[in-house]
A protein has these predicted regions:
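Acidic, low-complexity mobile loops and tails
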Residues: 1-36, 45, 83-89, 99
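Glycine-rich dinucleotide-binding loop and its adjacent helix/turn
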Residues: 85-91, 144, 239-294, 298, ...
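FAD-site-proximal beta/loop scaffold in flavoenzymes
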Residues: 252-269, 356-431
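A Rossmann-like FAD-binding core segment of flavoenzymes
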Residues: 171, 205-208, 212-225, 230, ...
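Glycine-rich flavin
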Residues: 66, 88-102, 118-125, 130-268, ...
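Beta1/beta-strand and adjacent pyrophosphate-binding region of the FAD-binding site
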Residues: 95-110, 268-278
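Flexible, glycine-rich terminal cap/loop adjacent to redox cofactors
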Residues: 107-112, 116, 121-133, 138, ...
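Short hydrophobic core segments
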Residues: 105-107, 211, 229-240, 274-275, ...
Length: 564
């Protein structure tokens, strides 16, 4: 029998086949996820309507399909069709109402929410996960993963252009942004499908819809005419963040993009002006530059990446300038205008003077803010932070309402995916009576510029502000053999020691493999490892990790392969 695509959500006329979860010969049962289907409304699972054996798969990942197309051929029994129209992408028959009483309700399926749900289920809690959009939240769909996919494509393209350094030359290199975006989407789809698989395997019920509080322990979830009233002993709010809005005249002009739009832009501009020199802005600045785009960055603060140490900020500034990226700090954007030729004109004030930059596109990258939209928190006793900047929580992630927790970007502690995930685990442990607290002193942070930047623990400025007596050791990647073979000699490893306590309290890395190396520094600080123990540890050669060993030696006798 032929299994066809019988409907699509919304007004979509066609879709793309995402991750295929089955193989010829597989036996599937009712509601098993066969494919992921991607429409312009997002990603949805295509589930089996009965128990049957897969005889032939007629489509491939990435193939465009439309209603009526045969997706696969199977043998077995299909559940009889209902008289009412059924949406095979997760929607139930319209008008359904259901009352539920459970142990744990998680609102939001980002890296905080879905980890909380899986961890809670593994710990024996009857768990429901609610999500109004795609599984994976901002990080997986329009944040961490898509950005890093583009960063890698840009890096590969730039290396091919500069192959002469490595002894080869490629002529007529052509960049196809449609394929770059398609690769990004495929990676995302695979990961979304993986989350859906894990939820099914852990018997977690996923309800797609928008959640709003009725009272302190009752939540209404609506999608279309379907309504679910859920009463939960414990609720974890994990609704993440949304792009911050800024009042700049002209911000709604058609050539102005936000980060979400930039991640799906299949037409590469010749030039772009980026408003914001923070993490998002600088990651996009380097990836666009590696794609050959002329980039300018306008930053309000007196330096880019103001959250990292000054020497790290200055190092990445020098590298950016060497790549032709224009940087304008201490600059306030006053308006955006459209030129006669349709280009964007960004007007800003700098040192009392009005200046302007002209570019094909403008990217606004000024950060994100907690997303509490539609939750109807006014129906509860939940307290918010000052100026309503997120949900107020204690170190155990509890709100002021017993049984309600808030994790991730929505509590506005630290906007990092790995922080959200760990907060979720701590919350579930506390639900189970373990009385745990979230520790923020040793949270690694990574910025995917070129080269990468990573830091953990206290910064030099924080130590100075706290009057901590410190010693600093730096080891440059220019003295590291592996970095030289990679053609990446810029940057350094920096380690900070508290002389009074006799332990390492912070560190920064700017250079090759920083995103991976930071885990070693995190472990060193978290476990209070002494210099002696680190010095006695054998680091593999040739690796960039040897730089950590050298930097630690620099705190005492001095590095072996570098002499200041």
């Amino acid at each position: 029998m032929d299994i066809k695509l019988e409907s699509l959500s919304g007004k979509s006329k066609s879709a793309k086949v995402g991750k295929i979860n089955i193989q010829v010969g597989d036996k599937v049962k009712l509601n098993d996820v066969l494919f992921q289907i991607e429409t312009n409304k997002g990603n949805s699972p295509l589930k089996a309507k009965g128990s049957y054996k897969i005889e032939e798969i007629k489509v491939t990942e990435g193939q465009e399909v439309k209603v009526g197309d045969t997706l696969l051929i199977a043998s077995g029994e299909v559940v009889a069709k209902e008289t009412k129209k059924v949406d095979y992408f997760g929607n139930l028959i319209q008008g359904k109402k259901e009352n539920l009483n459970i142990d744990l309700l998680v609102v939001g399926a980002g890296p905080g929410g879905y980890v909380s749900a899986i961890y809670g289920a593994k710990k024996g809690l009857n768990t429901i996960l609610v999500e109004k959009d795609n599984l994976g939240g901002t990080c997986l769909n329009v944040g961490c993963i898509p950005t890093k996919s583009l960063v890698k494509s840009a890096e590969a393209y730039n290396e091919a252009l500069n192959g002469e350094e490595f002894g080869f030359e490629i002529k007529d290199i052509k960049l196809d942004m449609k394929k770059v975006i398609a690769r990004k989407d495929k990676i995302r789809n695979n990961l979304v499908g993986g989350i859906d698989y894990l939820l099914n395997k852990n018997n977690i019920r996923l309800i797609k819809g928008e959640a709003s509080f009725i009272d302190n322990h009752k939540v209404l979830v609506k999608k279309g005419r379907d309504e679910y009233t859920i009463e939960a002993k414990n609720i974890i709010i994990a609704t993440g963040s949304k792009i911050s809005k800024i009042s700049i005249p002209g911000i709604d002009l058609p050539f102005v993009l936000n980060s979400t739009e930039a991640l799906s832009n299949t037409e590469l501009p010749k030039s772009i002006t980026i408003i914001g020199g923070g993490v998002i802005g600088m990651e996009f600045a380097f990836l666009y530059s590696n794609f050959g785009v002329k980039v300018n960055v306008v930053e309000y603060e007196n330096r880019i990446l103001s959250m990292v140490d000054l020497d790290v900020s200055e190092e990445i500034l020098d590298i950016a300038k060497s790549k032709g990226i224009g940087i304008y700090t201490s600059s306030k954007v006053t308006r955006i205008e459209k030129s006669e030729s349709g280009e964007g004109i960004v007007i800003f004030e700098n040192e009392g003077n009005e200046k302007l930059l002209v570019s094909e596109k403008v990217l606004v990258a000024i950060g994100r803010e907690p997303n509490m939209e539609g939750l109807n928190l006014e129906n509860t006793d939940i307290e918010l932070n000052d100026r309503n900047r997120g949900i107020k929580v204690e170190s155990n992630l509890k709100t002021n309402v017993e049984g309600i927790y808030a994790i991730g970007d929505v509590n506005n502690k630290i906007q990092l995916a790995h922080v959200a995930s760990h907060q979720g685990i701590v919350s579930v442990d506390n639900i189970l009576g373990e009385n745990k607290e979230m520790q923020y002193e040793c949270i690694p942070n990574v910025i995917f510029t070129a080269p990468e930047i990573a830091s953990v623990g206290l910064t030099e400025k924080q130590c100075i502000d706290k009057n901590i007596n410190i010693k600093i050791s730096k080891f440059p990647f220019a003295a590291n053999g592996k970095a030289l073979t990679m053609g990446q000699e810029n940057g350094f490893i920096k380690i900070i020691k508290d002389l009074d306590l006799g332990k390492i309290v912070g560190g920064s890395i700017i250079g090759p493999d920083a995103s991976s190396l930071i885990s070693t520094l995190t472990l060193i600080i978290q476990q209070n490892m002494s210099e002696e123990r680190i010095a006695e540890t054998v680091f593999a050669h040739p690796t960039t990790g040897e730089g950590i060993h050298e930097a630690v030696l620099g705190l005492s006798i001095g590095a072996i392969h570098y002499n200041e």
